[in-house]
Curated annotation (Swiss-Prot):
Any GO BP: response to cation stress
GO molecular function terms listed in the Swiss-Prot or TrEMBL record: carbohydrate binding
Lineage: Eukaryota, Amoebozoa, Evosea, Eumycetozoa, Dictyostelia
Gene Ontology, cellular component aspect: cytoplasm; nucleus
Organism superkingdom: Eukaryota
Domain (Ricin B-type lectin) ranges: 47-174
Family listed: Belongs to the cup family.
PANTHER family per the UniProt record, alphabetical: CALCIUM UP-REGULATED PROTEIN A-RELATED (PTHR31599), CALCIUM UP-REGULATED PROTEIN I-RELATED (PTHR31599:SF3)
Protein name in UniProt: Putative calcium up-regulated protein I
Keywords: Lectin
Pfam families, per database record: Ricin_B_lectin
Length: 691
């Protein structure tokens, strides 16, 4: 509250107290309790003043108190394992105006060998978002299997390159020094070209190299991962008790506690959301000195508690801002999901299966926010991602977020999603409790709330919430559509040079059609799973394109899309498989139709690949084996597939068995029957996720 309001409230409290107890002085704690009538009166006056001064904040706090309470007696967190997430690589050396610059790919080109450069944090620039793979590759969001490397022509320029297993592409982030170290040359790290002797001031377009700086304190070779998720460290730090008060200070502490809330320990009220810490602050400011305590001792305790009240209220406001964001986005009782299902021509109450991943929903939403609001988006990420990390590891069912992919009927989809949304909010409340009950955590968090910018900032102002919601909605809607659309639609591939005399439908809407820019003979279109004559509405496709999805990632199932791919030709007896790699690790798969008919395909990071081959020996039913490997040729998964061929009907594809290595999740395969009447093959999509 403002100083003016504090003074006004203090005066009102003093006047009210004098009217009620004009002759009473502070002697013993049991003699200073105000009547319930007076407490209610003062509370009402404070509330009225508070509403006039901070109407939006007061409204938010009232809502908080009415819908939730904080848990207590939580066990300490020993560790938090961060999940894979998209981040900025932000150089600690600022430009001449004190603005941060991030590592990106020059021109946003996807050609191997493109220079990595520094550039101001830019909206909607996927080349500035990176993900660290399990083995240390720095994977770009710009394209699958597009990773950071360096040029071995003697220039040592940092480049974006195609994935390989050379150590030049393996990096380690040293959190102690802030250096991104290269595994190929010891003691070398990513930095600004020409700055190994001493720091220089970078500009947009400054080239990056790997080099060995003379001074490890050189900011040109130091980086922050943004968001940095500082709450992971704070919440796992050793417990630190609040300062103790000896002798008369403890007497003063009890005196104040009794006066404010009729308890012996006012700190027990920090997690009680039904009380107002600003009200306590103003009450405490108005207290007269007890006659039996020195002013110095009393002021010492009052000053310490005043600091604690301020720090605690900052944390409550931070979590309250997240809660407002969360409720606006997720607590709509399935309204947004129902609207999108209607756009997809799906009945949300039907028993049609939907498949997806809650982690993918959160991830898609988060990188949408980072792209749209690179300045303030990381503040939300610093809160949300830690809560997700805690939820995935939680053993308490109420707080557990489901990490593995799910398959549910559409009628149960909202229940599945909302259970995880509630678990996310529960973990945020748990975080709030832990921060409010530990002095060390409270002090550190206060410092980050006061830090207005930077990778560790938690300075979430209430005015930011609307922008964060607006930035989150596109990513959230796309994530929901990635779950819904494969239940109704698949991608069809038409090859003009190899079509078996089957023609391309002539009524495909332009919004549902895409020609491969690298091969004009290849056309992709989206249509109903059962017929090539039913297409998504233009309103649905406009929503997808309007939310920034590229045609290439949509029609080739990249960045969270997991469509089946059917081949449009007269070979209707085949069952075309698509492998969707939803991980930051490069994969490949082998498909074996027979001992002599074996094919191998790469599956880039966050991308899909498929085969146009089929069993050329099959007359009736056929079987094939799919084996998936990682980039080191280690086994990841195996799937046995059966293709049943029916006269005058399309091939029916099914999975006989499957298995998966530790560290990965195999999603439920989506199996679709082909069509004799419409001349398309059976199809299957097999999604794979990281554990």
């Amino acid at each position: 509250m403002s100083n003016k309001l504090n003074k006004q409230i203090s005066t009102e409290i003093s006047e009210c107290y004098l009217k009620e107890k004009p002759q009473q002085s502070f002697k013993k704690s049991n003699e200073i309790k105000m009547s319930n009538e007076l407490i209610n009166k003062i509370s009402n006056e404070i509330s009225n003043c508070y509403l006039k001064e901070k109407p939006q904040q007061a409204k938010k706090e009232t809502k908080k108190k009415s819908i939730r309470s904080l848990p207590t007696d939580l066990p300490p967190l020993k560790s938090i394992t961060p999940l894979k997430s998209w981040i900025f690589l932000q150089c600690r050396q600022m430009d001449a105006n004190g603005n941060p610059l991030c590592c990106g790919v020059s021109g946003r080109y996807t050609q191997p060998g493109t220079q990595c450069i520094l550039w101001q944090i830019d909206e909607n620039d996927p080349s500035q978002l990176w993900q660290i793979s399990k083995d240390g590759h720095l994977v770009s969001l710009l394209a699958g299997n597009y990773v950071m490397d360096y040029n071995n022509d003697g220039t040592n320029l940092a480049i974006a390159n195609g994935w390989n297993n050379y150590t030049s592409q393996i990096w380690t982030y040293n959190s102690s020094t802030g250096q991104i170290e290269n595994s190929n040359y010891p003691n070398t790290c990513l930095g600004i070209k020409g700055a190994f002797n001493e720091p220089i001031t970078p500009t947009n377009g400054t080239e990056l190299v790997i080099d060995q700086p003379i001074d490890n304190n050189n900011l040109c070779f130091q980086w922050d991962l943004v968001p940095s998720y500082p709450l992971n460290t704070i919440l796992t730090s050793p417990p630190q008790a609040f300062p103790t008060f000896p002798g008369d200070q403890n007497t003063a502490f009890i005196e104040i506690s009794q006066y404010l809330s009729n308890v012996d320990d006012i700190r027990s009220q920090y997690t009680n959301l039904s009380v107002s810490l600003p009200f306590f602050q103003s009450q405490m400011s108005a207290m007269s000195y007890p006659s039996y305590l020195s002013h110095e001792e009393f002021d010492f305790v009052r000053d310490q508690l005043s600091t604690e009240f301020n720090y605690a209220q900052e944390i409550i406001n931070l979590i309250g801002n997240y809660e407002s964001f969360h409720n606006e986005l997720f607590a709509d009782n399935s309204a947004r999901l129902n609207q999108l299902a209607t756009l997809c021509q799906l009945e949300i109450g039907s028993d049609i299966n939907a498949m997806g991943s809650v982690i993918q929903v959160f991830s898609g939403m988060m990188y949408s926010i980072l792209e749209a609001l690179p300045g303030v988006g990381p503040i939300l990420g610093n809160v949300l991602q830690t809560a997700v990390n805690i939820g995935v590891a939680a053993s308490d069912g109420h707080s557990t977020i489901q990490p593995d992919p799910f398959q549910v009927a559409l009628s149960n989809l909202w229940d599945t999603l909302s259970t995880n949304y509630e678990a996310l909010l529960s973990n945020v409340s748990n975080m709030e409790t832990m921060l409010l009950q530990d002095w060390g955590m409270m002090v550190t968090t206060h410092g980050l709330i006061e830090t207005l910018s930077g990778p560790n900032s938690l300075a979430w102002q209430s005015s930011m919430t609307g922008d964060l919601i607006s930035a989150a909605v596109p990513g959230y809607e796309i994530s929901l559509l990635q779950i819904l659309m494969p239940s109704k639609y698949q991608i069809y591939r038409y090859d003009l040079a190899n079509n078996g005399n089957v023609g391309l439908p002539d009524d495909i809407p332009s919004s549902c059609l895409w020609t491969d820019p690298n091969d004009s003979n290849i056309t992709y279109f989206i249509a109903d799973n059962e017929t090539t004559k039913v297409y998504p509405d233009d309103s649905l496709m406009s929503l997808i394109w309007g939310n920034g999805v590229s045609e290439q990632e949509f029609f080739l199932s990249a960045n969270g899309w997991n469509f089946c791919m059917s081949l449009l030709n007269d070979n209707i007896g085949s069952g075309a498989p698509t492998i969707s790699n939803n991980t930051s690790t490069a994969l490949n798969f082998k498909i074996q139709f027979s001992p002599t008919q074996i094919y191998n395909y790469d599956v880039p990071t966050h991308s899909s690949n498929f085969t146009t081959e089929f069993d050329n020996t099959a007359i009736e039913n056929s079987y094939y084996q799919i084996t998936i490997y990682d980039n080191t040729n280690s086994w990841v998964a195996s799937i046995s597939v059966r293709v049943d061929i029916f006269v005058m009907r399309g091939a029916d594809v099914s999975v006989l068995s499957s298995s998966c290595a530790d560290g990965y999740y195999l999603g439920t395969p989506n199996c679709l029957q082909g069509s004799f009447a419409h001349s398309f093959t059976g199809s299957i999509n097999i999604p794979i996720f990281e554990n």
